[in-house]
């Protein structure tokens, strides 16, 4: 079955093409750290021949506690992104939380991301659609894979069909997430075979029921990522940090930066193998 291709400049994203890495850091902690992390990703992905898009947030507007670090904000964040682009020539993805931010952010980065908690907010969807930018939609933890077609339709009605869908797990009772790998293909089916990527970092989140920040299961990142890649997807979303224990957001789920190359070697091997198989129709 023909898969939809979404272009991010010269990077082609599709379920049957070699996977694209959307990776970086959770939130911009400082200009220097962002440059260091991006440089490492660029070095590794160029060595391995993996198409790459740098990811970071300028504002984590949905932190559990009002006292948690949110980021440098819109103005400073865009300055850092511009400097990263100039230094490394990379494409960039970041999230927006308000309709008023959409065009400002789209003028700087290449992919704007609709956060999971906001994915059904029609005003935000419409504002993002109007930018004409490539859109990455995080599947809400509380929305079934089959319902993602409605969000894609909203973007299409707004004149934007350059949509990527991203799974980051589903609620499993309270304070836990699981990933339904069967849902990846369901999302493809309800979205005209739009590219589907897997956010393994946030799928590893779990919570202390009485705590003010998410915990995580970093030790299981390879197992979960390998399982997701084996389905046959367009890309992988992974955050890394040189010192996860002291990261300002989601450190317990972050890949140690020095493990990036061996991790990606595994992912590339699985992706190459899975996509070498002919399509097998088991419906008939």
UniProtKB/Swiss-Prot annotation:
Which top-level enzyme class is recorded in the Swiss-Prot or TrEMBL entry? transferase
A Gene Ontology BP annotation from the UniProt entry: keto-3-deoxy-D-manno-octulosonic acid biosynthetic process
- What catalytic activity does the UniProt entry give for this protein? D-arabinose 5-phosphate + phosphoenolpyruvate + H2O = 3-deoxy-alpha-D-manno-2-octulosonate-8-phosphate + phosphate
What InterPro entries has UniProt attached to this entry?
Aldolase_TIM, DAHP1/KDSA, KDO8P_synthase
Cellular component, GO, one term: cytoplasm
Q: Kindly list the places in or outside the cell where this protein is found, as annotated in its UniProt entry.
A: Cytoplasm
> Which pathway?
Carbohydrate biosynthesis; 3-deoxy-D-manno-octulosonate biosynthesis; 3-deoxy-D-manno-octulosonate from D-ribulose 5-phosphate: step 2/3; Bacterial outer membrane biogenesis; lipopolysaccharide biosynthesis
Q: Is Transferase tagged as a keyword?
A: yes
Which keywords does this Swiss-Prot/TrEMBL entry list? Answer: Cytoplasm, Lipopolysaccharide biosynthesis, Transferase
Q: Which GO terms describe its molecular function?
A: 3-deoxy-8-phosphooctulonate synthase activity
The EC number(s) attached to this protein equal 2.5.1.55
UniProt lists the family membership as follows: Belongs to the KdsA family.
Please give the name of this protein.
Answer: 2-dehydro-3-deoxyphosphooctonate aldolase
Q: Which organism is it from?
A: Erwinia tasmaniensis (strain DSM 17950 / CFBP 7177 / CIP 109463 / NCPPB 4357 / Et1/99)
């Amino acid at each position: 079955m023909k898969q939809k291709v979404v272009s991010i400049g010269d990077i082609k994203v599709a379920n049957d093409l070699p996977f694209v890495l959307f990776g970086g850091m959770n939130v911009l902690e400082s200009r220097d750290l962002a440059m260091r992390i991006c440089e490492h990703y660029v070095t590794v992905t160029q060595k391995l021949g993996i198409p790459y898009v740098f990811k970071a947030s300028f504002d984590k507007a949905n932190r559990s506690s009002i006292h948690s670090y949110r980021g440098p904000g819109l103005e400073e964040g865009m300055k850092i992104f511009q400097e990263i682009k100039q230094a490394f020539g990379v494409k960039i993805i970041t999230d927006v939380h308000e309709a008023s931010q959409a065009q400002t952010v789209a003028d700087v980065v290449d992919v704007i991301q609709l956060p999971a908690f906001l994915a059904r907010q029609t005003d935000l969807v419409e504002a993002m659609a109007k930018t004409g930018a490539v859109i990455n939609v995080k599947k809400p933890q509380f929305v079934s894979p089959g319902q993602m077609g409605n969000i894609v339709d909203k973007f299409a009605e707004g004149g934007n069909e350059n949509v990527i869908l991203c799974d980051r797990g589903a609620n499993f009772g309270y304070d836990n997430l699981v990933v339904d790998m069967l849902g990846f293909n369901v999302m493809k089916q309800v979205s005209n075979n739009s590219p589907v990527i897997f956010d393994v970092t946030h799928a590893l989140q779990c919570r202390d029921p009485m705590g003010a920040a998410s915990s995580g299961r970093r030790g299981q990142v390879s197992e979960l990522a390998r399982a997701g890649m084996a389905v046959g997807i367009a890309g992988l979303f992974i955050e890394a940090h040189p010192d996860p224990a002291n990261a300002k957001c989601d450190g317990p789920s972050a890949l140690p930066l020095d493990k990036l190359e061996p991790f990606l070697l595994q992912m590339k091997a699985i992706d190459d193998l899975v996509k070498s198989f002919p399509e097998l129709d088991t419906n008939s």
